[in-house]
Regions:
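Short hinge/gating elements
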Residues: 52-60, 217-224, 246-250
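Short conserved micro-motifs at the rims of enzyme active sites and ligand-binding pockets
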Residues: 175-177, 224-229, 276
Length: 352
């Protein structure tokens, strides 16, 4: 494995980047923690963060390396598949409120559609969102097949859709989140790959079209390294690897990975591309973080508003029982619930 040692310290890295004006302007706009990631890459301390969209799509580019993505997906699904097409994900119905850091949609040789997503935190991508995402993919395929076959269309022409979600971290700050509780329940706490599909408790044998594969990279880091020689272990190790020391050990175990890490090392000679990819990753992360925080805030506001509405309803009932007039009830609500006169009157009229 190639490990370059072109730079001795941060100052020499920044002097090098400064010779590329576009890269330097982007680099200087980064937060300190992201500057450190860039510095560590050029100092050969860290590899590129492959869980982030621009880096993943560069290393798993289907045009230049058609086998890599096929092998990764095959190892997850447990069956050999071939990626034949990268599909646009711009029209996906699922936007915002999740900490998405990588997203790719592909068509397999048998016509199936597979999405591979990497989420920063499991709490931001609950089962309801996964269900919606899978339904989106199924509807997308249905419309494509129906438009292609027209009057010859039948439902047997629709292939499976596989939703693969890789969680960079399933350990949330709040352990009462349902997704956290699911991943860390006692029977599955040491499992990093979870496969799900629709089954019947009677054993009725019907094959439905939606399947889910959920992977916890943080759990894999704890229990998965060096446990076996399966290809899935190799690919997940690649995604979980951050340092050149770990990368070197990985290449010793899987010599075919030398090519990948040599390609990563070569980017040291292309600082504009490296900084641009970091910039894209940072923007995607920040945009999704802001949206996630806004959605969390709105959910809290909605919850608090519900509590206020319930309190106001109880107060109105009490005033009705005490034979208060509607006008008195409105004035009391204004004082007790900090409402405007019009809002208080609307609540009284609604519940009187």
């Amino acid at each position: 494995m190639v490990k370059t040692n072109l730079f001795s310290d941060v100052a020499s890295v920044e002097q090098y980047i400064a010779t590329y004006p576009v890269a330097n302007a982007l680099y200087n706009s980064f937060r300190p923690d992201w500057k450190i990631l860039v510095q560590d890459f050029f100092l050969s301390k860290r590899t590129l963060p492959l869980t982030y969209d621009p880096f993943f799509k560069r290393i798993f580019n289907a045009d230049t390396h058609p086998d890599r993505l096929s092998r990764l997906i095959s190892s997850i699904l447990g069956q050999e598949v071939t990626v034949t097409e990268i599909l646009s994900n711009e029209d996906t119905l699922l936007k915002g409120s999740s900490l998405l850091i990588m997203d790719i949609v592909v068509r397999l040789a048998n016509g199936s559609i597979t999405t591979v997503e990497i989420q920063k935190l499991s709490a931001a991508f609950p089962a309801e969102r996964m269900s919606r995402y899978s339904a989106d993919l199924l509807l997308r395929q249905y419309e494509q097949v129906k438009n292609r076959l027209k009057k010859h269309f039948n439902y047997s022409s629709i292939n499976k859709v596989y939703t693969i979600v890789i969680f960079e971290n399933t350990d949330s700050e709040t352990t009462n989140v349902p997704v956290y509780q699911a991943f860390h329940a006692e029977p599955v706490a040491d499992k990093y790959l979870h496969h799900g599909k629709i089954t019947f408790d009677t054993g009725l044998n019907l094959e439905f079209l939606q399947e889910f594969y959920l992977i916890s990279l943080d759990v894999f880091r704890e229990v998965g390294y060096a446990k076996d020689d399966k290809e899935l272990t190799a690919w997940l190790s690649l995604l979980a690897t951050n340092t050149y020391e770990d990368a070197s050990l990985l290449c010793q175990k899987y010599p075919w990975m030398n090519e990948i890490f040599e390609e990563i090392s070569e980017y040291i000679h292309n600082p504009e591309e490296v900084v641009r990819m970091f910039s894209e990753a940072l923007k995607m992360m920040d945009d999704n973080m802001y949206q996630y925080m806004a959605d969390q805030h709105m959910a809290l506001v909605k919850e608090q508003q519900g509590k206020i509405d319930n309190l106001c309803t109880l107060l109105i009932e009490q005033m009705k029982e005490n034979n208060k007039s509607k006008e008195d009830a409105v004035k009391n609500l204004v004082a007790a619930c900090d409402l405007s006169y019009d809002n208080a009157k609307e609540l009284v009229d609604k519940n009187w």
